[in-house]
Every structure is written in structure tokens, then in C-alpha cells.
From Swiss-Prot:
SUPFAM superfamilies: Ribonuclease H-like (SSF53098). Its cofactor is Mg(2+). Belongs to the RuvC family. Poxviruses-type subfamily. One of its GO terms (molecular function) is magnesium ion binding. Binds 1 Mg(2+) ion per subunit. The keyword Magnesium applies. GO terms for biological process: DNA recombination; DNA repair. The gene is OPG149. It is an enzyme of class 3 (hydrolase). This is Resolvase OPG149. Signal peptide: none annotated.
Amino acid sequence: MSSPMSKKDYSSEIICAFDIGAKNPARTVLEVKDNSVRVLDISKLDWSSDWERRIAKDLSQYEYTTVLLERQPRRSPYVKFIYFIKGFLYHTSAAKVICVSPVMSGNSYRDRKKRSVEAFLDWMDTFGLRDSVPDRRKLDDVADSFNLAMRYVLDKWNTNYTPYNRCKSRNYIKKM
């Protein structure tokens, strides 16, 4: 006999988005169910040492249906994280792993990061979670992971969100 909690709810989708990096990787986990979005987790991670074990632990915390990874330049030292995640989930999960371009585009790195944090804080107001956002100067990594996940959800719903408009929608997904 199984309990209702042990049965997988197939009407919901668990979306995980990673902003890749060794020092400041970040993860956002959203549950999309019946046209609503619930924030399950927004975390700064640390993959600076023993990264294989730490990534495996971070990947094993939820049953994802979709994992979004921020695309990295071909010669980036962080490409190893993408291949490790794809390999780890290949036989152990039904999750779809997708490499996507960053949400924000623009002339300067600083401008992109500023707009990403502003959009993130606006979403935190919308979800009623602004008070739980720590007062930190380094929010751009969690903001980037959150914006990756929200752009994916909004694109699935064919919903336009002005801060994400500078990205050519639907062209951001690329097989790696």
C-alpha cells in the first residue's frame, strides 16, 4: 500500500534552473501546476571543491521534469559542470536537460546583471517573497537562475514579459 505522498503528481512540472559557476553557482526550483507557479527553492550553491559530490547532492534533492543550464562558451572551465549534470541525469532521471542562453542581453555585463536583479526583485514582490530575499550585494547569480526558470515557464505559456523581451524568444534553446 502506498501513501498519497509517495505517488508522483504527473499534473505538475518541476523546473530547475542552474546559473553555472564554481564560486557562485545558483539554483532555482519552480513547481508549475494548473497554470500556477510555486517557488520551491532559490539557493546559492558552492561547487568550489569536491564539485562532483556537491553537484550530485544538489541534483538529487528533487525529482525534476526539466533542468535548465545556462549555456557556457565552449572553452569555459564551467562546461565540465554541464556535461557532468547531463551525464548524471542521463540514466538516473526522466528530466529533460536543456542548455539555454542567458535571459538578459545588452551592451555591458554590469547592465545585464543590474536588469536581471531588478526583474528578480520584481518577481519576488509578485510572489510575496521579497522579505525572504537576503540583503546582499551579490544577488545576480540567484537572479539569473530564477530568470532562466521564469522565462522558460512564460515561454511555455506564450506569455510576454517586458524585461525578457530583448532576448529573441524561442531562439535561446540550443542543444549542446
